[in-house]
Amino acid sequence: MASSRLRRFVDLLRHTPLHPQWLLSDRRIVTGKLRTLGSGHILDIGCADRWVEAKLPAGCEYTGIDYFVTGSLMYGASPDAFADAAALPLRDASVDAVVILEVIEHLPSPRQALHEIARVLRPGGQLLLSVPFLYPIHDAPYDFQRFTEHGLAHEIELAGMRVSELRPSLGAVQTAGLIVCLALGGMAAESVRRRSLGVLLFPFAALAVSIINVTAWVAGKLLPGWTAVTAGYVAVARKS
């Protein structure tokens, strides 16, 4: 009960530097890509609360799907249908674009899912995909793997799609700050769960998180990037 109250409280801080994931709250890279998908039938795999739908160009036909176990039980998802990404309930060449954000790390068969995406895409159809890289295990036990940029490109192209863009989702210094903030947040949550004396340090952890977040954000604007260290990747591809 205490941990659920803590989670709700922390969620209220999501868009402030007090939140351990504040450095991830800027979705401009992904939302910018969503606006370029054009009209047509857009399939959103792992749609959760369907936030993608509001970011798409006017005139799109949107279909959101999610996996029942994680989508419904963990996130309260509201899809058009519950389905397995490795066995999509759509006809061949029936969609113009597929959006799959922070999902394939949770799939036991990501290669099969990418082949399914290629199957339902029309020739020339687009894929917009994002994945974490340097990021803690989450949604356990449904967190199975991480991909490097080279491994991700290989899997996409193996499925019959051509990568046109693959970029880090967060700079190196912001990623370093994010990891430290997540570690502090995770330890604070564990202290609450175990009812240990560590809860007394919660105010200091919150202060440290806010300082690290702001410092990392500013440093990221001033220092050159290093693509070997990133919280994740955003990829754009087309079906050949």
Regions found by a protein language model. Give the residues of each.
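Conserved N-terminal segment of class I S-adenosyl-L-methionine
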Residues: M1-A93, A97, L101, L114, ...
